[in-house]
Design a protein with these regions (language model features):
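Short, basic/hydrophobic alpha-helical segments
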Residues: 41-44, 93-107
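Electropositive, glycine- and tryptophan-enriched low-complexity nucleic-acid-binding patches
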Residues: 62-100
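Amphipathic alpha-helical interaction motifs in eukaryotic regulatory proteins
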Residues: 2, 96-100, 134
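Short coil/turn segments at secondary-structure boundaries
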Residues: 12-13, 69-73, 81-83, 136, ...
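Electropositive nucleic-acid engagement tracts
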Residues: 1-50
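Charged (Asp/Glu and Lys/Arg) segments that form or flank catalytic channels of large polymer-
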Residues: 92, 104-191
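Short hydrophobic beta-strand that contains or immediately precedes a catalytic carboxylate
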Residues: 58-59
Length: 191
């Protein structure tokens, strides 16, 4: 526009057409999952100092999508999306692929999310479970004990085949931050 003298001389034009090119090499799409494969590279691109102890991984899995976002513990830095997929059913295999793609074993962030996602990460059976509690060995079918018994034994291990544990846990129980209310990336739902 300046070359045709359509703008005044003091007008500055900025072009943002290629700002995404640095990020394209950091993210990879595989089996319908878009995932950041180089978290350190992403942080360098965004000019953020990455200390894994200062971040927590939030995983949300509504009906039609799966999202993974890094939140800063002090909420002074922006949220950083590290994974997204559409039309993938949440399953142990999908979560395992996601955790391997973002190199969770390298960073070992604390994890927060809804109880269904946390149960998947811990390898628990998804439906019709007898021992559905993550922390205690509470029998969900013993309704007569729910209101009379106050002390339930702590869950000793997450061994596959014992007390509704189907798969090997992908994260340590100590890395889980339990939600106080159901969370959503968009809005917080209050029941």
């Amino acid at each position: 526009m300046q070359q045709w003298n359509l703008l005044k001389e003091n007008v500055i034009i900025s072009v943002y057409r290629k700002t995404h090119e640095d990020l394209v090499q950091i993210f990879k799409m595989e089996r319908g999952l878009v995932t950041c494969t180089d978290i350190d590279g992403l942080m360098r691109t965004l000019n953020i100092n990455h200390n894994p102890l200062d971040w927590r991984l939030f995983i949300e899995s509504p009906k039609l999508s799966l999202k993974a976002v890094l939140f800063h513990n002090g909420n002074t830095l922006p949220s950083i999306p590290v994974g997204h997929s559409v039309h993938n059913k949440e399953s142990y295999e999908i979560m395992k692929i996601r955790m391997e793609a973002i190199n969770y074993d390298k960073f070992k962030w604390k994890i927060c999310g809804d109880l269904e996602v946390i149960a998947l990460l811990l390898g628990l059976q998804q439906r019709f479970t007898k021992y559905c509690c993550l922390v205690f060995e509470m029998d969900s079918r013993a309704l007569y004990l729910h209101y009379s018994r106050k002390d339930w034994p702590a869950r000793k291990s997450l061994e596959p085949g014992i007390m509704n544990v189907e798969n090997q846990p992908q994260v340590e129980l100590s890395k889980i931050l339990l939600p106080s209310i159901p969370l959503n990336l968009g809005l917080t739902k209050i029941l």
